[in-house]
């Protein structure tokens, strides 16, 4: 995969430039554009993934299915599709927006900061997973209700962005729609 960049943003969310992804994530990470996605299978189960230990931020942490950064000129939806193929080896249904104005800042235990305008999407797949070990060290298909109970009881066991997304009332309602079989 070619070198990825992040799209830097000003406080109003207007693009101001780009920076190489690895170099962008530091103790002083500038605001940038990202996305987060929640992937459901044909049984209505959610895919939760454990980030590879080689990840710069939050290595080894359980999180939602796929996260990433759209590239210059790429839509968020196309970025979700690209990263699902790269990280999970799957084709997905067109991503649906479930929390379009999500924005957060969080610092991991090693001092690396995430500072993102991060629209949240959900999609479905019927493909068998082909996990990229450079991105994902473990995964589990789970009932959404069980995951939400786990987040409510032990938020420290999950990525902060997953917790913030899952505790948003409207996002929970929209995620629940993906548990219905189609």
UniProtKB/Swiss-Prot annotation:
The lineage of its organism: Bacteria, Pseudomonadati, Pseudomonadota, Gammaproteobacteria, Enterobacterales. It is found in: Cytoplasm. It catalyses: isopentenyl diphosphate = dimethylallyl diphosphate. The keyword Manganese applies. Its EC number is 5.3.3.2. It comes from the Bacteria. Residues 30-164 form the Nudix hydrolase domain. Binds 1 Mg(2+) ion per subunit. The magnesium ion binds only when substrate is bound. Binds 1 Mn(2+) ion per subunit. Its main location: cytoplasm. This is Isopentenyl-diphosphate Delta-isomerase. The gene is idi. Keywords: Cytoplasm, Isomerase, Isoprene biosynthesis, Magnesium, Manganese, Metal-binding. Mg(2+) binds at residues 67, 87. The active site is at residues 67, 116. GO terms for cellular component: cytoplasm. Pathway: Isoprenoid biosynthesis; dimethylallyl diphosphate biosynthesis; dimethylallyl diphosphate from isopentenyl diphosphate: step 1/1. Homodimer. Belongs to the IPP isomerase type 1 family. One of its GO terms (molecular function) is isopentenyl-diphosphate delta-isomerase activity. InterPro entries: Idi_bact, IsopentenylPP_isomerase_typ1, NUDIX_hydrolase-like_dom_sf, NUDIX_hydrolase_dom. PANTHER family: ISOPENTENYL-DIPHOSPHATE DELTA-ISOMERASE. Catalyzes the 1,3-allylic rearrangement of the homoallylic substrate isopentenyl (IPP) to its highly electrophilic allylic isomer, dimethylallyl diphosphate (DMAPP). The keyword RNA-binding does not apply. Its cofactor is Mg(2+); Mn(2+). It is an enzyme of class 5 (isomerase).
